[in-house]
Amino acid sequence: MVHGHPAQTQGTFRDLLLRNKPERKTYVVDTPGKGVQEAILDYWVMERTDALSKVRIRLQTGRTHQIRAQFSSRQLPLAGDRKYSLLEDDCEIALWSYRLGFDHPDTGKRMEFSMEPPKIYPWTEF
């Protein structure tokens, strides 16, 4: 759930990220360098209100704070994100893993789990 509306209803964010360990924060940077990693995610806008967009995300890479840093760098901070947003939200961070899937390490069987977000703000806006 992000504040604002992405320019396109679906797309791919491809950025370079630099992790600042003392700050415990990740930044989008313009140039490669020591510690800089490529970060890629695909997104789809599922629903919108006047102020919020409910976004589905598929990570192609899994960097620390990747979703938060990439959306915030585009002035689309996650609702409730006190680290990457200057907005004062009266909610917890609105980042929810709706579905998780992986192959079981012993059996190789595909494992799939899903769960709806809680029925609290901002999820109740949709």
PLM regions with names:
Residues 1-126:
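RNA pseudouridine synthases
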